[in-house]
Amino acid sequence: MNDLEEIVYKHALLNAAKHKGSANPGAVIGSIMSQEPDLRSRAKEIGPIAGKIVAQVNKLSEDEQSAQMAKYHVEVKENKQKKEEGLQELPGSHDNVVMRFAPNPSGPLHIGHARAAVPNAEYVKRYGGKLILRIEDTDPKRVFEPAYDLIPQDLEWLGIKADEVYYQSDRFEIYYDYARQLIEKGAAYMCTCDGATFKELKDNCKPCPCRDNSVEKNLELWDKFDQMHAGEAVLRVKTDINHKNPAIRDWVAMRIVEETHPRLGNKYRVYPMMNFSVAVDDHLMGMSHVLRGKDHLANSEKQKYLYDHMGWDVPEFIHYGRLKMEDIALSTSKALEGISSGKYSGWDDPRLGTLKAIARRGIQPQTIYNLITEIGVKMSDSAISWKKIYGLNRNFLEPIANRYFFVENPVEITVDGYEDGAVDIERPLHADHEDRGNRILPFAGKAYLASEDVKDGISRLMDAVNVDIDGDKITYNSTSFEQARDLKAKIIQWVPVEDNVNVSIVMDDASTKTGLGEGALKDLKVGDVVQFERVGFARLDEIKDNELVFYYAHK
């Protein structure tokens, strides 16, 4: 037994112990993917091994399994008080797990979209399954054409790669075929009632006259459907006209749309409604599990009628609670309106909650991925805030961000009485990573200070000199750090007069801080994240002429 087989064997024994001696291959794979992150890249290799080893373990008696657990030091750890968090095990079969992320192309993705994308991707990774990206673009009014390219880019930033990609606008002929099949089964009918009449009948649990049309009559109307005007007719799926929820009673599957579609032009006029196209595609694409918000509970029930009419197996529907976004602007329509009016500079304006905006600020993709994974999939509502995001992101930035000086609204000062001549002051790029080396800050009695730091009293220019500030007069006091401490001197940053660069920092409220940074910043590349001491983390966004433009992340 090689090392990989031994790991699989231990997980199989543990799973068997939890399930009366019977291990499940999918659950074993899921356990490995969850607890052995280094092996996730070998999921396809692990699958066949797990199947073989689980079969071996299941042939053992429970006593034999216990003996093997003792031999391999496998223990069942019980912790009933453990708080439920993270992604719990998927219900149902874990064989051939197929899941999907299915956004509307109304704009780029924001944190709310990650709520759906991340769990689907993570579950597929855990169980060695397949992830489908399906662009649900069957409502021309909700299509923002650039989103066709923006959505895959955002998923790539999150580290999510779909195994297959589909566009619902490419699948109209498929929807037409299944609509006709429903009519032929007597499970759908063409309804020519006006909306108000149908609503009154539906609200009173009464069928409309069209419900009793013959199959032949419905097919005749179906064949003429694309010649009708919007609102003249719809195709309805038969459900229960007495259902307690009026929205589920004979819901609309197809309607006329007269708007021009960005991808289709005016090729089609008969458009599927979401519940119809989604159910057809989920069946044809082999979805094993469907994750959706609890606001889709009624839609899941609607779609089950279609599954029943067609004799299809129903996937595992899993619903999760709302994700409340405290102080995070997420509305795509409001963002687009703000961009059009000039309120926002674009989809990556730092005030927005789009993935592009937070990436521009130096928020790491793993921060968002881990945050959503930690929230998990549960019916109770959850809340996130910038404070929570910043706390997680700080863990990623602390070890990678080198430290630099920046002074806002710089004031050049001369230290009277300084006689030590020119010196090069060395400060580490990162105190915890000496291997990265030092920055050199030349000092010869002159420096730039932030205007807010030029205040009367004793101050220490960090690692340089102690000075006495009295109005416009700045006098040398000493060099000793111990003396600065005894004098309770204020420690302030400074930037060399001899070696500096113009810096602007776009803040999270879109305001801009301008000033000077030390010369070592010139070695940075766009995309690098730094920590400006006493200011916070920031990502280099642009290098232009003699100016570096950063976007502020957080403290």
UniProtKB/Swiss-Prot annotation:
EC number, as in UniProt: 6.1.1.17
Motif window: 'HIGH' region: 103-113
Main location: cytoplasm
UniProt keyword Ligase, yes or no: yes
GO cellular component, one term: protein-containing complex
Keyword tRNA processing: no
Coiled-coil residue spans: none
Gene3D superfamilies: 2.40.240.100, HUPs, Ribosomal Protein L25, Chain P
Disulfide pairings: none
SUPFAM superfamilies (alphabetical): Nucleotidylyl transferase, Ribosomal protein L25-like
GO biological process, one term: amide biosynthetic process
Protein name from the UniProt record: Glutamate--tRNA ligase
Gene expressing this chain: gltX
